[in-house]
Amino acid sequence: MAPKDDPDNRGFDDQRRPSQRSTVLAIPALAVNDPKSDPKIASDLPANYVDDDDDAPKMYTPSLLEKILNYALCRGDIANQQLEAQPVSIPGLFRYGKKFDYLLLFIGTICAIISGVSQPILALVSGRVTNALLVYPPTSKQFRNKANENVYIFLGIGIFISITNFIQYMCFQHCCTRVMAQMRHRFVYSVLRQNAGWFDKNHSGTITTKLNDSMERIREGIGDKLGVLLRGFAMLIAAIVVAYIYEWRLASMMLGVAPTCCICMSLLARQMTSTTIKELIGVGKAGSIAEESLMGVRTVQAFNGQEEMVGRYEAELEKGRKFAVWKGFWSGFFGGLFFFWLFSFLGCGMLYGAYLLKVGIITTPGDVFIVVMSMLLGAYFLGLISPHMMVLLNARVSAASIYQTIDRVPKIDPYSKAGKRLQNVVGRVKFENVHFRYPSRKDAKILNGLNLVVEPGTSVALVGHSGCGKSTSVGLLTRLYEPEAGNVTIDGTDVRELNIEWLRNTVGIVQQEPILFNDTIHNNLLIGNPGSTRETMIEVCKMANAHDFIEKMPKGYDTLIGDGGVQLSGGQKQRVAIARTLIRDPKVLLLDEATSALDAQSESIVQSALNNASKGRTTIMIAHRLSTIREADKIVFFEKGVIVEAGNHEELVRLGGRYFDLVKAQQFKADPEATEEFEEEEIDLDDTSRSSRRSSMTSARSGSEAFRRGNSLNDSFSGSKRSAQADAENSAFAANEAAIMAEDGQITAGYLDIFKNAKGNYLYMFLGTVFALIRGLELPALALIFGWVFEGFTFVPYGGRMMHRMAMAVIAFASVGVGVWFSQLASSVLFAVVSENLSMRFRVQSFRNLLYQDASYFDNPAHAPGKLITRLASDAPNIKAVVDARMLQVIYALAAIIANIAIAFIYCWQIGILGTSLILLLAFVMIGLAYKISLMNVEQIQNDDAGRIAIEIIENVKTIQLLTRCELFFDHYQTSSKQQKRSELKKGMIEAINYSLTQSFMYFMMCFTYAVGIRIIYQGDKSSDDTFKGIIAMMLGAVAVMNSAQYFPEFVKAKTAAGMLFNIIYRKPRTGDLMEGDRPEIRGNILFENVKFSYPQRPLQPIMKGLQWTALRGQTVALVGPSGSGKSTNIGMLERFYDVTGGALRIDGQDIRKLSLFHLRTQMALVGQEPRLFAGTIRENVCLGLKDVPLEKINQALELANANRFLANLPAGIDTDVGEKGGQLSGGQKQRIAIARALVRDPKILLLDEATSALDSESERAVQEALDRAREGRTCITIAHRLSSIQNSDLIVYIDKGKVQEAGNHTQLMHQKGRYYKLIKKQDLAV
């Protein structure tokens, strides 16, 4: 049950959540807003309250007492470390367990202890059999009866151990699955609560890496590995107890190995912890790069930036790889040293035991074997579980990082129930002397004493240059951020005193870059208001001019729109976002460039709807297209964070100030044909202007003629020679695409396929395998030495001859220890190099091939970026199991098994046959189980939506918070993760069967080999010495099977992961190889020739139905038309994100599918509708895909894009970090950087898809002038809904319903008074 005082528990039963113990109280207005500076407020804050200034890492350093205790408890990992957070304790890993989980943990622990305690019985029973062999005549019935008693004990223990091991594995795996589900839920829940300032400092890629990589490390640490660890420690303690029971002197002597072993393990843990933390940092940064690149893959492709992004990704992975290799070194060094000390003490124990036997303190040699074998088994298994200890250490370090996020309670907490909820909202908004700077950019002040009053029911428009603080003001009103000084109030109440959820429900916002989610249109609208009916949805969609296009979708309102709304155009997305806001019926409406992506007709309809929706409510608008705000009650002009002009449209125009300059910048050319027939001669121009105008008219006429020729071609196209050529070309390309699609099935990968991809590492693998095989000869060597020792105890009386044999045994055991030390060190380092190289190669190859895929690949919901990022984060590390320390254990085991089988055949072939048969039987069972688990893994991955949803949440958390739907998305994540949880539990059952069989296998092996061996000795077929050597050999072979089988789940997972990655690595894009094709000189003539096209995900909904238009070299062609008419698709096809499905698209007369895609894109430059920047400096973003660009050229491009003015105000200039996705820049600033990125390439074809939509009028005019200069001598295709920016185009093409409806220049189309004319009249700002 949830705690009574926890109304927002969300099903989390753990009352230790600080955020549920207390909540942030309403904070009164302060001149300088630091809650901790006011003692009254500070006393009410949660213990783990933080603000953005508190997020700097606070280094943890253990005290002297802690260091001593850490070393004493084998926790040297934190004995001398300075870490950002203290690694959590082992119990702390289960802090989110519930009562049932603790019950499972208790039962599993009991079973693990029972299983561990039972292991020394093996030594005890073996000792009793040894006594029977040495004391009684081998052919006597007394020998046979005594020996057979122990056989039945082996059988009974084997059955008992198999049951306890099954229960142990199931309990730990079930508990782990449930605890990890809770931990993931809490992590996502906590991410949803964090404030905007935290996200400015914590990139979404790093958060995603935590969710995938760090969580996986914790899962590995608290699952079956913990059971194995507990079993190992129980085995060690039980072994010590048994040894002390039989002979305390010998046991005490052998216990001397403990301090040295503890020191080894502590030093190992210390080194592993520090290197793991450094490794995680590199992996996290690489994850951020991968996430950004895949989320903005079209931008990366358009600028041929694939290899640059791959280079950045690889560089960060390389940093982590170096530390991972060091982990292999330390593991091998200290692990080998452990075994050296163990075997040295083992030899000394045999020597001392022989001495005690000689002097009569020990009466039978079997007791020596019991004590020595007990201590050996305990210590040996402790050494073998050292890799599991490293896994546990990794889990503790990762958990510390995860818990920091989970425990963080921000000052602006969307889950807080505190704060006022005003009953009768009037809607008076006031900004009073507001100062603000972003937490991540303390050196740049955005608002500098803003004073603004918005009276109830009025509309106020904010205008000004990009980056002047307009959107920041909106962020302060919605409490994404808080001012550093001053107050923001609603109806006289400081927004900091209001309940956040109530505030954001009261204030509805349409953001500059609309965010939609990977769901149906219906569900996206429900996010706005979960209680809405379909009738209400249809009503608001009609208001937002969205209903008509939605009805034309394949499933109407139930159509899936893909990741980020990829199936919709920019204008369609914005209309759905507007409808989603209107359905909330907010009291205060914030419109941040709400209609920037709409065509003029849609904008007029939607603006009218917004004007109607604004009636009776306070509305704050931000718009660069001034026609949308001319009806506002008040227009305020921002500059440098303060208001410099205010008034309505007419007042500000009469004032003739800055606003008037913006209006003039957006006025259209005078239209002399508005009331009379058009005559070119009557236009009064000077000679120069007339010459220029005639040139423009000639160009326009050529374009119009081309359009008319295109229309006539449409009528008789099927019979033309060019049509036949286009059809033949399409048939060839269609056949190629069909072949690619046929190859795009599921690729099944085997272990050999993984090794085939290890080119360049074969020498390391060979040498590593050689050393691993040498390391694997340890158990056969021990079998021979034990057989040799057994013979020594037959030297009766026990005297000098026996002691000499034991002295030689000391040397033999120490020699094996030295061999193990050096072979383990060498093999561990070599395989660490191979595993990290291979994992990095798979990551890089997968990432590289993803960046080269065509757009249709990403349109497929199965290939949503969220899912692909999860695959990159988890599959490549999973493959490492085949080539890292786990593979070493298997090689050790294989070498030991083969060598022990050989020894058994040499000394007793009957035992050899029996043991080999048992091992093969177990192998067949394991293969069957592996196949079953592999199928379950594939099914689980294919059905896993939880990872995609989590990434969608992380990417769009600010939007989710503003919509007050944190809990809705959290519920969605919880629901989707239940399927994953069920799959894990089913898979755990199969893995538990495997674990049970392999861990009890040694007892069954001993049972059957001793049963047959006793019979052989009794019948006199073999001597007891040879039979004993054969049995010991097979026993140690069974130990090898048991040791290696625990890695069985990881190997199955590696095979599944390899198949998933190979599907990515070997997939060929439909657009073909980037470098193949012709590379002619591009002049810039473009022809859309009867082009037909449908998106692959919507084949029955054609976008182009015989589209025909031409752009001649050096022309500027503007594409206009309703949102969703296919304008951006035209540009996407020129960039070859998609290929035509009918007709042909030609550049300079050649089908672009025959051109090298790399060459084609080097001749083009694209400025997209939603400019995508990447983490890094402004310089790096401008030069994306280019090498060695001179600084002068970069500055020239930035100046052309009108970016130099705001750059001058940045302390680091062009070396300023723009933040993740350019988050540190305003929308207009981002767009200017994107324009500079295009201009620096000096392209032959310039593609501008709403290139100036986020710019203020003055910046737009300056940038437009720059673009006008930049397009001289090159072909320019531009899309713009702000028609003032395209009126000087040589040709304007109006596209609707998949065809060209009108074409001509501005004057010609105005003369026609058709569709274009109507759009112009809607945006006319004539004064």
From Swiss-Prot:
It is a multi-pass membrane protein. One of its GO terms (molecular function) is ATP hydrolysis activity. Residues 1-104, 173-225, 269-331, 386-766, 827-886, 932-996, 1052-1327 are cytoplasmic. It is found in: Apical cell membrane. GO terms for biological process: response to nematicide; transmembrane transport. Residues 126-151, 247, 353-364, 790-805, 908-910, 1018-1030 are extracellular. Residues 694-704 have a biased composition (Low complexity). Residues 106-394, 766-1053 form the ABC transmembrane type-1 domain. Its EC number is 7.6.-.-. It comes from Caenorhabditis elegans. Residues 1-17 have a biased composition (Basic and acidic residues). Belongs to the ABC transporter superfamily. ABCB family. Multidrug resistance exporter (TC 3.A.1.201) subfamily. Contributes to the establishment of a polar lipid barrier to block small molecule passage into the pharyngeal cuticle. Probably exports polar lipids into the developing pharyngeal cuticle to protect against xenobiotic insult. Likely functions in the same pathway as sphingomyelin synthase sms-5. Residues 711-721 have a biased composition (Polar residues). Residues 673-686 have a biased composition (Acidic residues). Residues 1-23, 671-721 are annotated as: Disordered. Gene3D superfamilies: ABC transporter type 1, transmembrane domain, P-loop containing nucleotide triphosphate hydrolases. This is P-glycoprotein 14. One of its GO terms (cellular component) is membrane. Keywords: ATP-binding, Cell membrane, Membrane, Nucleotide-binding, Repeat, Translocase, Transmembrane, Transmembrane helix. It comes from the Eukaryota. ATP binds at residues 464-471, 1121-1128. PROSITE patterns: ABC_TM1F, ABC_TRANSPORTER_1, ABC_TRANSPORTER_2. Expressed in pharyngeal epithelial cells that surround the anterior pharyngeal cuticle. Shares same expression pattern as sms-5. The chain crosses the membrane at residues 105-125, 152-172, 226-246, 248-268, 332-352, 365-385, 767-789, 806-826, 887-907, 911-931, 997-1017, 1031-1051. Residues 429-665, 1086-1322 form the ABC transporter domain.
